[in-house]
Structures are given as C-alpha cells and as structure tokens.
C-alpha cells in the first residue's frame, strides 16, 4: 500500500489503499489547503520528478533540499549524525550517517519515517505535538520538558510559539565555536536578515500574543549563540544573532502592544 504524501505541505501518512479524506496539517489554521484542493502524491512519484540539492553551509553543516521546490520548500540540515528538520525526498546518497532525526515542528515532519528506516535512525519529536504525527512508527521517541541533549555539542530547546512543541537546535561548536541556532521557522529569519519574526500562522498572518513572545524572549536570552540558520537556503543571520533576536522580540512587542512601528504612535 502506498504512503500518501500531501502535495501542499509534504506530510506523509500511514500506508493505505486510498488517500486520506483530507490533511489535518493543512486544515489547521497554521497551514492551508491549496487553491486546487487537496492533492496527493507518493515518495516514489516524487523521485521521478525531483532531485536532491546538497550544499555545505559551513564546516560541519550540510544543507539538503529538494528541486524543483516541493510543498513548503524548506531544506533540512545535517550536523554530526543529526538530521535537523526534514524534506520529503529521501536520498541516502546525500549524507554518510544519520543516527537521530529531530524536527522543529509538524510542518516539517514530512517523510520522517522513510528517512528513519533508510538510515536506521531514531526520531525525536516534542510530545506537545504528538497529535500531528500522521504516520506513527516505533522509531519515533517523544521527549518532554524544555531541553533534550543529543550530544555534547547538540541540544534541543523547546521555544513553543508557532506550535506548542516548537523546537530549535543549539549547535555549540558552530560558527567557529560561537554557537549556532538551527531555528526552522520557530524563529523566522525575515527578508532583512538583521531581524526575525514570530507567528502562530505564517501563511494566514496570525500573530502570537505578547505573553508568548515574552516567554520565548526569556528562553533565547538564556542561550549562547552568534548565528542562526533558518528553514530556507537564503534565510540566516551570520553574526550577532542573539542580540538581533532579542531586539526583534522587543520590536514585535512594541507593535502588538503599543502600536509602535505601525504608524499608530
């Protein structure tokens, strides 16, 4: 039986003879159903029309994407033996070893089970987002709390926000030892790469409340890092990233609580 993949978000579902009646990920207000309605494909069909894009981002960090762009269009990152976030096209030629897969939030779960089976890897997902797993597997381990250590140099940090279990990965050895945050779009690097933003729903432009931004800001303030890599090839902050995230949180709070930055003051 095929494991159907949603064309709009890239989420893979448990094998079935017929496609699911809909995609809960896309029916949620944080995503959307495509203008042409619900459409499905499979990993096998995807391999016939798409290929992997692999690039070194910095020493020790490799980006993995899909071309032409498919679904949300994010790219994954490989560091040490960790695959951070996921892309729908599984390709065992792009990296040598994956022991652990960790994902920032459900929009990037995609084909995590296929990747885990191909590399004999475990998958770490925050338990707060358990309901969004569309293809259960014994390889999936749900972690709880605010932090989960993967190795001496890698740690998962729950930031929440976009999803309750929204996670970033702290890579302590990155940026020549100054520290890197792999953020997905939990911290969304915007077009002006001196800033990030935060949203409950990006495609539908639904903001987060002030209390959640203040909480996220407090967590970020406790971390040591100088660089951020977001979910897309061109979205990163090369230096002074922590200060820029904190400044971005302050700007966001000004905009939603006092109207500053919106021409209201």
Residue ranges and their predicted role:
Residues 2-60, 64-65:
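N-terminal juxtadomain amphipathic helix
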Residues 2-21, 28-32, 45-60, 81-90, 99, 113-164, 206-221, ...:
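Metallo-beta-lactamase
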Residues 106, 128, 233:
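Short, ordered loop/turn segments at secondary-structure junctions
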Residues 72, 91, 108, 212-213:
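Amphipathic coiled-coil/heptad-repeat helices and related helical stalk/stem segments
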Residues 2, 60-62, 73-77, 165-167:
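Short beta-strand micro-motifs in enzyme catalytic cores
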Residues 88-125:
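Active-site metal-binding motif and surrounding structural segment of the metallo-beta-lactamase
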Residues 68-96:
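A glycine-rich, hydrophobic loop/mini-helix early in the fold
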């Amino acid at each position: 039986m095929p494991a159907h993949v949603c064309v709009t978000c890239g989420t893979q579902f448990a094998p079935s003879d017929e496609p699911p009646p809909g995609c809960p990920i896309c029916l949620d207000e944080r995503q959307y159903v495509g203008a042409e309605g619900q459409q499905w494909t499979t990993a096998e069909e995807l391999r016939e029309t798409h290929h992997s894009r692999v690039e070194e981002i910095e020493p020790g960090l490799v980006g993995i994407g899909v071309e032409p762009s498919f679904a949300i269009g994010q790219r994954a990152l490989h560091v040490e033996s960790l695959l951070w976030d996921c892309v729908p096209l599984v390709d065992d030629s792009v990296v040598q070893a994956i022991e652990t897969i960790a994902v920032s939030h459900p929009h990037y779960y995609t084909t995590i089970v296929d990747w885990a089976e191909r590399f004999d890897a475990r998958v770490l997902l925050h338990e707060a987002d358990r309901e969004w797993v569309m293809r259960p597997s014994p390889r999936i381990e749900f972690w709880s709390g605010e932090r989960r250590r993967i190795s001496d140099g890698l740690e998962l940090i729950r930031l929440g926000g976009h999803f309750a279990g929204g996670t970033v990965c702290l890579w302590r050895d990155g940026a020549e030892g100054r520290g890197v945050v792999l953020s997905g779009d939990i911290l969304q690097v915007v077009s002006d790469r001196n800033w990030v933003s935060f949203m409950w729903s990006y495609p539908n432009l639904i903001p987060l409340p002030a209390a959640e931004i203040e909480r996220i800001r407090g967590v970020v303030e406790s971390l040591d890092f100088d660089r951020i890599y977001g979910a897309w090839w061109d979205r990163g902050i090369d230096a002074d990233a922590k200060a820029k995230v904190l400044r971005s949180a302050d700007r966001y709070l000004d905009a939603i609580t006092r109207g500053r930055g919106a021409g209201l003051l």
